[in-house]
């Protein structure tokens, strides 16, 4: 009997959580959008730094001989 009550309570909680997510997805996904944007900034920074790193590598090989 207690197991049935616990199972019903867990099912009700999951149903409420799913309805809350589908009802208002904007605030919940805002955190993930910020993380995604931060990853894009890091990727863009690496792409922009690529030629500079290549020049430094060439300069060090020229200096080394």
UniProtKB/Swiss-Prot annotation:
What compartments host this protein?
Answer: Secreted
Q: Pfam families under this entry?
A: Cecropin (PF00272)
Q: What induces it?
A: Induced by A.niger alpha-1,3-glucan.
According to the UniProt entry, the coiled-coil residues are none
GO BP terms: antibacterial humoral response; defense response to Gram-positive bacterium; innate immune response
Give the record's keywords alphabetically.
Antimicrobial, Immunity, Innate immunity, Secreted, Signal
The record's listing under InterPro entries reads: Cecropin
Q: Which residues form the signal peptide?
A: 1-23
Gene Ontology CC: extracellular region
Q: What is its main location?
A: secreted
Query: Which family would the database say this protein is a member of?
Result: Belongs to the cecropin family.
Q: What does this protein do?
A: Has antibacterial activity.
Its recorded name reads: Cecropin
Source organism per UniProt:
Galleria mellonella
């Amino acid at each position: 009997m207690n197991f049935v009550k616990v199972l019903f309570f867990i099912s009700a909680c999951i149903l409420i959580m799913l309805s809350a997510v589908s009802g208002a997805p904007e605030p919940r996904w805002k955190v993930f959008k910020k993380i995604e944007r931060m990853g894009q900034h890091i990727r863009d920074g690496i792409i922009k730094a690529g030629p500079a790193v290549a020049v430094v590598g060439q300069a060090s090989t020229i200096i080394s001989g």
